[in-house]
């Protein structure tokens, strides 16, 4: 493995700077959550994930951004900036600027989701070799994941005579236009209806199924099994050409969509395989709050978010003293709505024990 800890990662970043001339060795934007290249992805090395709620060991939920793990993460990121391993203009680096740095060869390491090979790396793969590794964790740290991934809510008026009709309609969408119905003969349908059905096991099923078939037919010389999805069949059909390209990048034309999919989703040294390693080692824990935003979160969430982002940025840029200012940061977080949010979320949590 290239790096197994934050310390080893730092050494790799130094190599990119010293031997490759990387001016932004790590792909880090000023945004701290909610997009590509955000600060929260890198804080995961220390078991921190802002705006999640974790059990403190006593049965109480605490905001991750106020924990010692966040303090450790900020200390590390500040050191990277001090040593020139982040972009010198980090304070103004939004995700689009970070993406530009990646495409200009100024960056060597990206933390991201398993589909990162498809964006933004797909255009770079013909001339650059990018490798996948699990997130390097501080000893004892665990990645914080959402227990429930909820993107949207549907609401029904109290005066509605038949509120159950909403669930019946959603079930109908999934039954007729969902997992199976959306698999067209020559491709697949991303979204036919406002309610999308995401099969959380689909990526792992595809990974396992294709790799089992490759044990029988390692060069994909035969047709894919008839019961496979259209997308899996598409990757299988492209696999022989992918092997030629892998052996010699000039042998065949790079097929951006399918080859990037194979590298990230199928290869046993790819991105999904790296995630499977993290799961197998039980190196994750959960965000324990998955309810509707509380009243205080709706009232104060914006100012709490701004408070965190400003402080994180100042710390990384060494404009704030982490040791002397940390307690004040937590105190201001509480006074800006955090105390009320914590009380409401712990009341919600207590009802579910």
Region spans (language model):
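Second-shell loop/turn segments in exported
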Residues: 1-3, 60-64, 290-298, 312-319
